[in-house]
């Protein structure tokens, strides 16, 4: 997701334009055209030579600085799928996992890029993260799109071996969906219960770094394969 930037000649960037202009416009010294040209030429040579005498490390810093702005794709720890009305609650849960448990980076579905199809965002969210958290609230089952999200996530975890057990239903503190109203497909999975005393232990058992690393490696290899095929 990053865009590279073109390099520019540091000599051209370093020429003291203020001084060279004063030489051209000043009439008090009545300098000849040849003398002006010689002085400007020496000025430019001095700047370029001073740049050439810089240590290799500093020259690399000057030339490569634009590349530091290049953004790379990041494999997320988790994505939270939620009803539109639960965006605030999803943000709270995201902050809880990231700040209290150190599970980051994560994202909520509402923060996915705008201007793209929902299906593309859903695919990127589920396959671009190690765990998919379904925020089970009263609003979740009222939204047809949410139903599609959790069925798609479950099918993805079944069809892809490395995504097995990656879908995590979670009942938050605020407006949780009662167990008896939870779809059967989700009742077969142990849900995270935020109000439970064992919630911290549940979080530690589920979000293991070793599992994340395995999925991250598979994700990188898949992405590299796709890039090679597109170039070919």
Curated annotation (Swiss-Prot):
Composition-biased stretches (Polar residues): 19-29
GO cellular component entries: cell projection; early endosome; endoplasmic reticulum; endosome; Golgi apparatus; late endosome; phagocytic cup; plasma membrane
TIR domain mapped to chain residues: 70-226
GO biological process: cellular response to lipopolysaccharide; defense response to virus; inflammatory response; innate immune response; phagocytosis; positive regulation of canonical NF-kappaB signal transduction; positive regulation of chemokine (C-C motif) ligand 5 production; positive regulation of interleukin-18-mediated signaling pathway
Subcellular locations according to the entry: Cytoplasm; Golgi apparatus; Cell membrane; Endoplasmic reticulum
Record's keyword terms, sorted: Cell membrane, Cell projection, Cytoplasm, Endoplasmic reticulum, Endosome, Golgi apparatus, Immunity, Inflammatory response, Innate immunity, Lipoprotein, Membrane, Myristate, Phosphoprotein
Region of interest called Disordered, as start-end residue ranges on this chain: 1-71
Main location: cytoplasm
Ranges of compositional bias, category Acidic residues: 55-71
Keyword Ribosomal protein: no
Record note on modification: Myristoylated. Required for membrane association which is critical for its ability to initiate efficient signaling.
Molecular function via GO: phospholipid binding; signaling adaptor activity
Domain of life: Eukaryota
Function: Functions as a sorting adapter in different signaling pathways to facilitate downstream signaling leading to type I interferon induction. In TLR4 signaling, physically bridges TLR4 and TICAM1 and functionally transmits signal to TICAM1 in early endosomes after endocytosis of TLR4. In TLR2 signaling, physically bridges TLR2 and MYD88 and is required for the TLR2-dependent movement of MYD88 to endosomes following ligand engagement. Involved in IL-18 signaling and is proposed to function as a sorting adapter for MYD88 in IL-18 signaling during adaptive immune response.
Listed name of the protein: TIR domain-containing adapter molecule 2
Organism annotation: Bos taurus
